[in-house]
A protein has these predicted regions:
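Non-membrane alpha-helical structural segments and their capping/turn regions in soluble enzymes
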Residues: 102-106, 137, 327-330, 334, ...
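A structural preference for short, pocket-lining loop segments at secondary-structure junctions
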Residues: 76-89, 104-129, 307-321, 331-358
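Glycine-/proline-rich flexible loop or hinge segments
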Residues: 57, 86-94
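Intrinsically disordered, low-complexity segments enriched in small/flexible residues
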Residues: 1-82, 226-315, 319-324, 334, ...
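Flexible beta-alpha connector loops of hexameric P-loop NTPases
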Residues: 93-100, 132-135, 323-328, 360-368
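Structural signal for hydrophobic packing residues in well-ordered secondary-structure cores
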Residues: 12-19, 109, 113, 144-147, ...
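Conserved catalytic cores of soluble enzyme domains
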Residues: 126-242, 354-470
Length: 472
């Protein structure tokens, strides 16, 4: 079990610059309900259900924690980056969500929306408050509506999952965030420890288990959290520019000479010594912030996604690593592209795959739907997308992540409707006809430029200052 900090301690561990918003949201919530003709449903005393002893329970919780509710919120600065900050007080009735909690949460979301700031939530909750019954449960709908308004305004939500994050708090503030971080060992899951099946695998309900299942983006040690959150705030804060410039095309890192034949292009792209996506991303970005998982239970280690910083700009990236891309990879890519589009962040995609995974497991995991979703995410994007093919461009599994009209190629890459070996087999050609088939497919970098598929062949950076020399 992870350490359970109070709300104030969790805030202090993240930042020393915090200005709490006190009182207004409860008054506003009460006035709104009174105006709707339900003045008795304000959560005061024994609450909207008249639950016996509820007032005493809240009084004891307040005396024990020093808080008047299970949520504290206000304006904060983390690493010099402004945000609206929410922190749950688990010591106050298990951090549960009641009507007044909903007032505070809605006020926090509205503050972020109206100020154009990111929202950071430090979540530690057991879910809805039983003593307020359905009135408490409907606070989840309020949070969902407030979250939708925040997204529509173009602001981001970063959640930090503390111990525990369960029930409706996980299903709204946690899982509904754009970026989800968690502290090591935190209990994370929809079902709390007292209501899950007795034979359930306890590892599935941990931060580490959720990371492996593609439900969260990273597990961050407490001492690294302030820097990580500050970097994410810098990356996620919309620039305000209605038309961000495209991501610059990366310099090629591998071969300089163009392949003579189609088969030469295939062999160069498949060479184990050719630079891969990791090398390109390291050379391109000052630092990167990974986004992991499709939020549907899957991950793809052969696809790197996230946001990076380059020369003071934020650029989102989706990079294939030379393996067959899984359905979870395409879903993750679509998630990242849509987030970047919403925040006005340009996108860079690096293509390097023999094709989409096509085994039985991939089919059961929804390969077709996942690829279709990736195509749709790129087609819908209003921010500029830049693509560089750095190795194998294997059919639709590669094309799904390639920008129409803004794709570049390296000298040691190829792009083809199908692998030459597969084409020869489908055409019932002899095995020794594969090389000739590669030529007929016109898959070389220079062929792609001539066909209008690629804009240019990108060369390695010159040793001195100067622009790269495109060919074609």
């Amino acid at each position: 079990m992870a350490d359970r900090l109070s709300a104030r301690a969790a805030i202090a561990a993240l930042t020393t610059e915090f200005e709490e918003c006190v009182g207004f949201e409860e008054r506003a919530g009460f006035e709104e309900r009174a105006g709707a003709g339900v003045p008795g449903r304000d959560g005061a005393g024994n609450g909207p259900l008249g639950w016996s002893g509820y007032a005493d329970s809240r009084a004891r919780a307040a005396a024990r924690t020093g808080e008047e509710e299970s949520v504290v919120h206000g304006l904060a600065s983390v690493g010099g980056r402004s945000c609206v900050l929410i922190a749950f007080e688990f010591g106050y009735l298990g951090g549960s969500l009641g009507q007044r909690t909903g007032d505070r949460l809605e006020a926090a979301y509205e503050a972020a929306r109206s100020r154009g700031l990111p929202l950071v939530s430090l979540v530690a909750t057991g879910g809805s408050r039983m003593q307020e019954g359905m009135v408490a449960l409907t606070q989840l709908q309020r949070v969902a509506r407030a979250s939708a308004r925040l997204r529509a305004a173009g602001s981001a939500h970063l959640a930090v999952l503390r111990d525990p994050t369960t029930g409706g708090g996980w299903a709204t503030l946690g899982a509904g965030a754009d970026v989800i971080l968690a502290l090591p060992g935190a209990q994370v899951g929809f079902a709390g420890s007292r209501v899950r099946p007795a034979d359930a695998d306890p590892r599935a309900y941990t931060a580490e288990g959720q990371l492996a299942a593609g439900q969260i983006d990273a597990v961050v040690p407490p001492d690294e959290l302030p820097r990580t959150v500050a970097r994410w705030l810098a990356a996620l804060h919309a620039s305000g520019s209605p038309a961000p410039g495209p991501a610059p095309v990366p310099d090629a890192l591998g071969a300089t000479g163009l392949p003579r034949t189609g088969w030469d292009a295939v062999e160069q792209a498949r060479s184990p010594s050719r630079p891969r996506a990791e090398a390109y991303l390291d050379a391109y970005f000052a630092h990167r912030l990974p986004l992991r998982g499709d939020r549907c239970g899957g991950t793809d280690p052969g696809l790197l996604c996230g946001f990076g910083r380059r020369e003071g700009r934020t650029i989102a990236y989706v990079a294939q690593c030379g393996t067959a891309t899984r359905p979870a990879g395409y879903r993750t890519a679509a998630r990242v592209i849509r987030l970047a589009d919403r925040l006005g962040v340009p996108v860079l995609t690096l293509i390097d795959t023999p094709g989409a995974a096509n085994g039985a497991e991939a089919e059961r995991a929804g390969a077709g739907a996942a690829i279709a979703d990736a195509f749709a995410a790129l087609a819908e994007a209003e921010v500029p997308v830049t693509t560089l093919v750095i190795g194998e461009g294997g059919s639709g599994g590669a094309l799904a992540l390639a920008a129409p009209g803004n794709t570049y190629v390296t000298p040691d890459s190829y792009f083809s409707v199908i692998a030459p070996e597969a084409a020869a087999a489908i055409l019932k050609r002899a095995p020794d006809a594969v090389r000739a088939t590669a030529d007929e497919l016109r898959l070389r970098p220079q062929d792609l430029v001539e066909l209008g598929i690629a804009r240019a062949v990108v060369r390695p950076a010159p040793p001195a200052d100067g622009d790269r020399e495109p060919v074609g």
